[in-house]
Amino acid sequence: MARIAGVDLPRNKRVVIGLTYIYGIGNSTAQKILSEAGVSEDVRVRDLTADQEDKIRAVVDKYKVEGDLRREVSLNIKRLSEIGSYRGLRHRRHLPVRGQNTKNNARTRKGPAVSIAGKKK
């Protein structure tokens, strides 16, 4: 099993799909990484040679992925909250940040609906 950026890639999947298991690498970034490393997208993870793994590892190390990226995102959110911006306020209140309506929807962000006691007839 290939281990890249601290993540075990699934052996039976193609490399381009396996790379997307790393936080911060999507489909297009995985394709760029493989073209830069000179590895075919159709190769399965189990069929990678040690040399190909090292090339992919070297290219992935140039990107900010996994823990570093998670830390950066959380620090960005913390910074927005500390400076008192509107976006920071929305993050603190666990509401949608990008202007969505909250009258009817936004259940994912707000959590399960809480019933109001004493509303019975």
From Swiss-Prot:
Quaternary structure annotation from Swiss-Prot or TrEMBL: Part of the 30S ribosomal subunit. Forms a loose heterodimer with protein S19. Forms two bridges to the 50S subunit in the 70S ribosome.
NCBIfam families according to UniProt: uS13_bact
InterPro entries on file: Rbsml_uS13_C, Ribosomal_uS13, Ribosomal_uS13-like_H2TH, Ribosomal_uS13_bac-type, Ribosomal_uS13_CS
Family: Belongs to the universal ribosomal protein uS13 family.
Keyword hit for Repeat: no
GO biological process: translation
SUPFAM superfamilies named in the record: S13-like H2TH domain
GO cellular component: cytosol; small ribosomal subunit
Cross-referenced Pfam families: Ribosomal_S13
Database matches in PANTHER family: 30S RIBOSOMAL PROTEIN S13/40S RIBOSOMAL PROTEIN S18, SMALL RIBOSOMAL SUBUNIT PROTEIN US13M
Gene source species: Ligilactobacillus salivarius (strain UCC118) (Lactobacillus salivarius)
Keywords, sorted A to Z: Ribonucleoprotein, Ribosomal protein, RNA-binding, rRNA-binding, tRNA-binding
Gene3D superfamilies, per database record: 1.10.8.50, 30s ribosomal protein s13, domain 2 (4.10.910.10)
Name the record gives this protein: Small ribosomal subunit protein uS13
Region Disordered, annotated ranges: 93-121
Cross-referenced PROSITE patterns: RIBOSOMAL_S13_1, RIBOSOMAL_S13_2
Biological role: Located at the top of the head of the 30S subunit, it contacts several helices of the 16S rRNA. In the 70S ribosome it contacts the 23S rRNA (bridge B1a) and protein L5 of the 50S subunit (bridge B1b), connecting the 2 subunits; these bridges are implicated in subunit movement. Contacts the tRNAs in the A and P-sites.
A GO term, aspect molecular function: rRNA binding
